């Protein structure tokens, strides 16, 4: 007889890990409320406590790095936008001069 492995979404895992301390539950209580095997929930909670987070979560350093990258991209996009605005105004004036 083969045993099917249950797959859980990242969101479900994160919510399950948050539920245990928020409701001051033991692993066994949390597992029974969520209809999970005790060992599974225990592994998720242990990983979260060790700083590994839930699967799919990122570290603070990774998030800060992404923020810096996004800020640089935003500044570049703003600069390009400003250049295009000035170019549009310039060519609009040139067009008006040529039509008079």
Swiss-Prot record:
GO biological-process terms attached to the record: DNA transposition
GO MF, one example: transposase activity
Alphabetical keyword list: Transposable element
Methyltransferase is among the record's keywords: no
InterPro entries, A to Z: Homeodomain-like_sf, RD_transcriptional_regulator, Transposase_8, WH-like_DNA-bd_sf
UniProt record similarity statement: Belongs to the transposase 8 family.
Protein name (database record): Insertion element IS600 uncharacterized 11 kDa protein
Native source species: Shigella sonnei
């Amino acid at each position: 007889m083969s045993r099917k492995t249950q797959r859980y979404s990242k969101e479900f895992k994160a919510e399950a890990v948050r539920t245990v301390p928020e409701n001051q539950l033991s692993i066994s209580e949390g597992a029974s409320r969520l209809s999970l095997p005790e060992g599974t929930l225990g592994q998720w909670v242990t990983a979260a406590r060790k700083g590994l987070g839930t699967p799919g979560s990122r570290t603070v350093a990774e998030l800060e790095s992404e923020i810096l990258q996004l800020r640089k991209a935003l500044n570049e996009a703003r600069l390009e936008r400003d250049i295009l605005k000035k170019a549009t105004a310039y060519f609009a004036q040139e067009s008006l001069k040529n039509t008079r």
